[in-house]
Amino acid sequence: MIYIFTMVFSLNVLILSSSAARYDYFQFTQQYQQAFCNSNPTPCKDPPDKLFTVHGLWPSTKVGRDPEYCKTKRYRKIQRLEPQLEIIWPNVSDRKANRGFWRKQWYKHGSCASPALPNQKHYFETVIRMFLAEKQNVSRILSMATIEPEGKNRTLLEIQNAIRAGTNNMIPKLKCQKVNGMTELVEVTLCHDSNLTQFINCPRPLPQASPYFCPIDDIQY
């Protein structure tokens, strides 16, 4: 009887440990609404703002595939947080579909964020705190360096230095996309350690062959 109990207990531990995700760091990714809509194959249903807003907070690995769709409890509506999420984390392509966007982000990424973010409430509250209270808002960081969304051509170094000035001199990850002959800054990722306690240099820079690789100059923002 003791032998059977031990086997069952060991099996349960094995199942639980196998469902836990392994990750090395977090990517806090924000997208510039106008550039996103310009590059999106499907037209955005709402006029975009000249702002960076949250795309997601993603547990990530330095080598191999990032964890996705981990075992989790059923998603629940987060009505108390929705007024803030609607501002900082909208579904840019269709704001009437915000809830579906948040749900997808939770199931795909947030479900794998334990132990740093052990549940859905903690996950969304942390994003709000990072963006608002901790001022990890890319629009604000660029503005502090007098880089405003004026549709001007910027150099890669100019953008990188501005962001590094607001993130303890850590290197961000940038995504650009060429639309109608112009290269636009589409996304900025700020990277954090696995406990979300400090900025780190973003691992895994985009290869030069990537369609999102940013050139050294003539980046419109």
From Swiss-Prot:
Catalytic activity: a ribonucleotidyl-ribonucleotide-RNA + H2O = a 3'-end 3'-phospho-ribonucleotide-RNA + a 5'-end dephospho-ribonucleoside-RNA + H(+)
UniProt KW Cell wall biogenesis/degradation keyword: no
Annotated InterPro entries: Ribonuclease_T2_eukaryotic (IPR033697), RNase_T2-like (IPR001568), RNase_T2-like_sf (IPR036430), RNase_T2_His_AS_1 (IPR018188)
Ligand binding (RNA): 31, 55, 91-92, 101, 104-105, 108-109
PROSITE patterns reported in the protein's UniProt record: RNASE_T2_1 (PS00530)
An example molecular function term from Gene Ontology annotations: ribonuclease T2 activity
PTMs per UniProt: N-linked core structure at Asn-91, Asn-137, and Asn-153 contains xylose and at Asn-195 contains xylose and fucose.
Glycosylation sites: 91, 137, 153, 195
Keywords, alphabetical: Disulfide bond, Endonuclease, Glycoprotein, Hydrolase, Lyase, Nuclease, Secreted, Signal
Family listed: Belongs to the RNase T2 family.
Protein's recorded name: Ribonuclease S-2
Provenance organism: Pyrus pyrifolia
